[in-house]
């Protein structure tokens, strides 16, 4: 989103502050400087928005709007009508104190218009994925959201018997503590009698909600594993799972989020996209000091990749075994083996140098997403060549 591009390719820019049932529009004619604005209610369509601009604007029109819960559909619809349209990352739009204190739809639209047409604009356009990729990504995010919600339910529910003096201490014949949240555990928790004055029905309701959530996680995961076998994603999942610490769900999460592997110019841009590059805290004479990772971008993939590296301390130099029906090319196999060896040595070197285990894992995760991108590029080229 550069000012030069706007002025050389488009005569009019229209900023949209989008809501579910209404939009506020602010527009400027780049040749004359004339500005206009309006508000459209009753769930306006892309055709209605474009019609307002076309009724007075001259030359090519570029539409822009903030990223938000309304998603990519407006952008797709406006592009289908033949107009240029970008969704702008809301994190890249500058906000003044006045903008935060005095907020309304028309002011937001004017602020976005000023931001994207400024000669020093640093606004970034969001990548618009294919509808297939967006649907798969929504399924992935729903699964991880359900996993986190289920974890919270488990902690809440298992804490109720414990708080009343009941401890799960069933053990195997070998003396090992049996796992919680098995059928035996649920039966045991259901048989617990709380102290007088505590509603027994609360524990029962929490148990039912937790068991239902666990079942929901299983169903969602099953759906993701079926997606992994779809022709669109299977080559990428098969290739990415050759990397240690990357299972089917992590591989699918990465593939559906990236969608088009060629959109990244280099590996560092991939790490930056997933918030795995260190921040900077330079000021005055304090220069060259890196801070914590930025945690910008897609949280789901970043968390999945880091959690997938939990087994990193136990990685050996042995190759990861392939599965029947999940064969990959020799180029992918060789690249994955090289990456696995590098990650193992990188982790061990950082730990031996005194870095904390989680810091070392995060550093490896930053390299791992680059490696996944590089392998994805190989697969994309093979698919294009009709391997």
Model-derived features: positions:
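Nucleic-acid-processing active sites and adjacent nucleic-acid-binding tracks
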Residues: 32-59
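Short alpha-helix plus adjacent loop in nuclease-associated cores
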Residues: 86-125, 175, 180, 287-296
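A short, charged helix-loop
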Residues: 113-141, 180-197
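Glycine-rich, often acidic, oxyanion-interacting loops/wings at catalytic, nucleic-acid
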Residues: 141-239
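Basic, amphipathic alpha-helical segments enriched in Lys/Arg and hydrophobic/aromatic residues
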Residues: 339-341, 345-387
